[in-house]
Every structure is written in structure tokens, then in C-alpha cells.
């Protein structure tokens, strides 16, 4: 018999992450900061590779969960500098090590998506224990998709929650031509949402870019049709 050996025995069949949003208070000496927070679990930063100014990410799978990542505004408010990797802030009187400082995007789209103020990234456990958490409300996974919508179906089956309370988005073909056409034809009703769901900033951004790309697709199709119309007119 033939036995195949994996080139990478430690490889995983899937990678996932979950997160919760909320509020948290950070303290450094006399400086206190109340900030929006995202409590992360799993490989969150693999899905969301934020722009690091200094330092590195931490993993929600780490044994120790006393880490945090802050943006440049938080770094200046707490320390007066953004060179603060390895320094300590207190969250609920518990010391947490700053592993990285990220640049918060400040473009028009980002602000409209919800990135209007300081955001701090901590472990889900930290947010639950020492902050105000809205509970896990985002789950993301990368997994094999041997046939169309296999992964989508597995996630939908495994969620086990009424679809009125969740929205499942399959991202691999999000900006494909068929999806762009679908977005064009849903113009006017697309912004209507009967579900009690608040999108995270990254989903708001993705939906915003869907609209932009759909508009550009309409423009492209019109340009493709123009020579045909011109030929017909000439005849």
C-alpha cells in the first residue's frame, strides 16, 4: 500500500476566530482611558492584519491572556509615546502587557464604518472579566470548500441559531461578477435590514466596498455597450 506523509504534520484543516465588542478602562499611573474594545479569540489578527506601528500581534490561543494591543491615540493618551511595546497597563487592577501599537485607519470610509474613536484589542477573557462586553457576536472561519457552498452549509448547520438573529457571509466570492450583479439589482433594498444585527466595522467596510465596486461595474458595462450603440446608430 502507498502511505502519504503530510509535508506539514502540524497543518490545520481550518483556522477560525471569534470576537466580542464592548468597552474597557485602561490605567497607567494617573492616566486613565475609557475606550471601545474588541475581545478576541482564536486567530483574529490572521483575519484582520491591522497596520502595526511597533510590536506584534498576540493570539487568542495563547495560554496567557494578559496582553493587549492599543492604537496610536491610546498610546499617546496613556504613555505620551507610541514606543510602548512591553510596557504595562492595568485593566481591572490586573497588569496587561502591551504587545503592539496599531495605526487606526482614519479615511472617510473607515470613519463611516465606525472607526471614529480609540479601539483597544484584548483577549475575550479580559473583556468579559474586566470590561463591558456584548458577548461573542462575530465568528470567522477559513476551511476547505471542495464543492460550491460546502463551507457555507457546514457553518450554517453548525451555528444552530435562528437565522433571524444571525447573518452568514461567504467571503471567497464576495467581489465576483455574479455577486456584483446581485448587488446592483438589490439597489434600494440592500440597505434595509430587518435583523437586530449591528455590523462590526470590518463588515461595514466590506459592504461599502461592495457598493463602490458594483457602481464601477455598472460604469464598465455602459462603456462596453457604448461602441455597440454607436455601430447601430451609424447603420
Language-model regions, residue ranges each:
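Generic extreme N-terminal start-of-chain segments
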Residues: 1-2, 235
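Short amphipathic beta-strand/extended segments in non-transmembrane regions
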Residues: 2-54, 170-171
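Short glycine-enriched loop/turn motifs at secondary-structure junctions
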Residues: 29-31, 59-63, 134-135
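A conserved catalytic-core signature of glycosyltransferases
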Residues: 35, 40, 64-65, 69-70
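Mid-to-C-terminal secondary-structure elements
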Residues: 43-52, 70-207
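Lumenal/extracellular "mature" regions of secretory-pathway glycan-modifying transferases
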Residues: 55-60, 86
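N-terminal membrane-entry
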Residues: 206-226
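Juxtamembrane interface at the cytosolic side of transmembrane helices
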Residues: 223-235
Amino acid at each position: 500500500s502507498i502511505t502519504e506523509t503530510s509535508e506539514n504534520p502540524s497543518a490545520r484543516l481550518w483556522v477560525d476566530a471569534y470576537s466580542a465588542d464592548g468597552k474597557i478602562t485602561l490605567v497607567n499611573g494617573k492616566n486613565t482611558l475609557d475606550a471601545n474594545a474588541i475581545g478576541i479569540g482564536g486567530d483574529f489578527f490572521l483575519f484582520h492584519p491591522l497596520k502595526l506601528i511597533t510590536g506584534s500581534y498576540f493570539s487568542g490561543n495563547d495560554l496567557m491572556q494578559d496582553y493587549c494591543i492599543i492604537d496610536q491615540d491610546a498610546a499617546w493618551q496613556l504613555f505620551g509615546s507610541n514606543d510602548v511595546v512591553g510596557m504595562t497597563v492595568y485593566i481591572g487592577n490586573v497588569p496587561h502587557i502591551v504587545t503592539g501599537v496599531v495605526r487606526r485607519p482614519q479615511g472617510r470610509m473607515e470613519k463611516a464604518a465606525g472607526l471614529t474613536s480609540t479601539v483597544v484589542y484584548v483577549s475575550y477573557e479580559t473583556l468579559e472579566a474586566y470590561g463591558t462586553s456584548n458577548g461573542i457576536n462575530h465568528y470567522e472561519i477559513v476551511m476547505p470548500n471542495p464543492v460550491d457552498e460546502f463551507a457555507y452549509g457546514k457553518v450554517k448547520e453548525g451555528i444552530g441559531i435562528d437565522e433571524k438573529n444571525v447573518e452568514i457571509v461567504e467571503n471567497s466570492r464576495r467581489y465576483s461578477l455574479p455577486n456584483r450583479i446581485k448587488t446592483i439589482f438589490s439597489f434600494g433594498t440592500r440597505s434595509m435590514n430587518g435583523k437586530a444585527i449591528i455590523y462590526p466595522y470590518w463588515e461595514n467596510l466590506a459592504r461599502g466596498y461592495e457598493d463602490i465596486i458594483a457602481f464601477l461595474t455598472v460604469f464598465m458595462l455602459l462603456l462596453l455597450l457604448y461602441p455597440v450603440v454607436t455601430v447601430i446608430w451609424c447603420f
